[in-house]
């Protein structure tokens, strides 16, 4: 399992297009991806990173930190791709 924390840099956070891009990458990878928002140093309940609706329910805003768990074949590559999406400044 590959785990990492990353600060979301998109001006809209993980909403709409960034959430859709994150979920699409997670789904197409074939890996199990779990995503949590970090609040006061503690991760919230994890959601399915391959579900755009679940990702959006976290309410991740620009500057928030997220905790991501990726498990499965190709987890290193999937984790790297998800980190790029989270750190993108595009909305």
At which residue positions do the language-model features occur?
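Short amphipathic
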Residues: 1-10
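Compositionally biased, low-complexity segments enriched in small residues
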Residues: 3, 50-53, 74
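Compact, glycine-rich, soluble single-domain proteins
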Residues: 9-53, 57-60
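Conserved beta-strand core positions
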Residues: 4, 31-33, 66
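C-terminal structural segments of small proteins and small subunits
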Residues: 56-91
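Solvent-exposed beta-strand sheet faces enriched in polar/charged residues
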Residues: 7, 36, 69-71
């Amino acid at each position: 399992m590959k785990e990492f924390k990353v600060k979301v840099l998109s001006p809209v956070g993980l909403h709409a297009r960034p959430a859709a891009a994150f979920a699409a990458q997670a789904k197409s990878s074939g890996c199990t991806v779990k995503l949590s928002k970090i609040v006061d140093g503690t991760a919230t309940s994890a959601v399915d990173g391959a579900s755009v609706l679940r990702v959006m329910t976290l309410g991740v805003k620009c500057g928030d930190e997220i905790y991501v768990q990726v498990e499965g074949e190709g987890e290193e590559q999937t984790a790297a791709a998800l980190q790029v999406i989270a750190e993108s400044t595009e909305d």
